[in-house]
Design a protein with these regions (language model features):
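A generic structural signal for short, non-catalytic loop/turn and secondary-structure boundary residues
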Residues: 1, 37, 53, 75-79
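Short, intrinsically disordered N-terminal pre-domain segments
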Residues: 1-18, 114-122
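A structural detector for beta-sheet-dominated domains
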Residues: 9-11, 45-47, 85-89
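Extended, solvent-exposed segments with strong compositional bias
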Residues: 13-35
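Amphipathic, interaction-prone secondary-structure segments
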Residues: 27-59
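Short, acidic/charged, Gly/Pro-enriched secondary-structure junctions
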Residues: 59-65
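Beta-strand-rich solenoidal segments
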Residues: 65-117
Length: 122
């Protein structure tokens, strides 16, 4: 079981997310964490993808109120999600080897690359 609460730091601002007790409907082996204002969520789950393969997911979501660009008097919640899925066999790779792949992937996600992705580059 992960720590409770979990601290997620975004742009040098720490956010405390407490376990809510709910699970992700798509996976009974999951947990949901949220800030007290419910504007940030962290979802963690594990699913069996194949007989010997597990799909582990960690997903961060943040929502905010945003004005309609065509009608400033109308505001709605908008959400952005960032997540990582690690699909791994139940045997054959050590936790250290998987972590090395994750750390390499995280290093790839520079500000420049994220900007290019948001610009629609492939």
């Amino acid at each position: 079981m992960l720590a409770d609460p979990i601290t997620l730091t975004v742009n040098a601002v720490p956010f405390t997310l407490n376990r809510t007790g709910e699970t992700d409907q798509s996976s009974p082996n999951s947990s949901v964490y949220a800030t007290s204002d419910l504007n940030r969520h962290l979802r963690v789950s594990h699913q069996t993808a194949k007989i010997d393969t597990v799909r582990s997911l960690i997903r961060s979501e943040v929502r905010k109120v945003s004005a309609d660009p065509l009608n400033a008097s109308i505001s709605t919640y908008k959400t952005v999600s960032v997540y990582l899925v690690i699909e791994h066999p139940t045997a054959g790779f050590s936790t250290t080897e998987i972590d090395q792949e994750v750390q390499g992937f995280k290093a790839l996600l520079t500000t420049s690359l994220v900007g290019e992705l948001m610009g629609g580059e492939v």
